[in-house]
Curated annotation (Swiss-Prot):
GO terms for molecular function: DNA-directed DNA polymerase activity. GO terms for biological process: DNA replication initiation. It holds the Pfam family Rep3_C. It comes from Escherichia coli. The gene is repA. This is Replication initiation protein.
Amino acid sequence: MSELVVFKANELAISRYDLTEHETKLILCCVALLNPTIENPTRKERTVSFTYNQYAQMMNISRENAYGVLAKATRELMTRTVEIRNPLVKGFEIFQWTNYAKFSSEKLELVFSEEILPYLFQLKKFIKYNLEHVKSFENKYSMRIYEWLLKELTQKKTHKANIEISLDEFKFMLMLENNYHEFKRLNQWVLKPISKDLNTYSNMKLVVDKRGRPTDTLIFQVELDRQMDLVTELENNQIKMNGDKIPTTITSDSYLHNGLRKTLHDALTAKIQLTSFEAKFLSDMQSKYDLNGSFSWLTQKQRTTLENILAKYGRI
């Protein structure tokens, strides 16, 4: 579970949509199973499938609950849309998240719509985070605000900031412009649950303040745990600035990457047969390397796992 990473374009992170908690978690799980480095993904490459047991394990729920949750969330998801606005031009895009789903006795297959592909593949400005940090959120707005705050921190190249947003803009982003006219109700049902989720389950610490009489501005005092290695560019810069030594490893990055490329190529040409875990893990490692240009973001556990797999097939 800790290896699943969500990649999203910045535009998608601040888009307008209204999904339930379970619909949001289903989407994030599916996004984390994609390979974001693929160019011009085919229908097969934008298709995600997993068993109900796998989903239950990923989300820490029972197998029986997994089927019911997935069935309801998937049916509703087929009717949901996402709205993306370009601040530089008037107008906006509206499209579906997915356009096909298939249930069998053991697994779910879901296909992302073609219109959403530019916001999930070949990304230039994007956010990324471990699915582990949001899977336990209890409020549907918590995941939205987590992504928005992460985008702001990433753009500012910092792990700590006071991020301001007008109350109207905040409600517009969450499609709440016609709800919670009294601030105390918004605070009770939206802001406090968001703070509780982020402070309890995620790698963010959050305090929400307000300004104005009546309130017209929200101030999010947010701090990202730098040890979680989610903002890779920031981490690399801080290591250089602080003069910290990068832990030495037996296998150099270039040697490790060459071994990774050979292994994936040999698997593609059927010279070797990877297990499902190995195939997903190596594909994820290649995706992250392509996006970051190095393996400096690897945890020791990830590096050891990668080295063991490559050594198993004689590629290092």
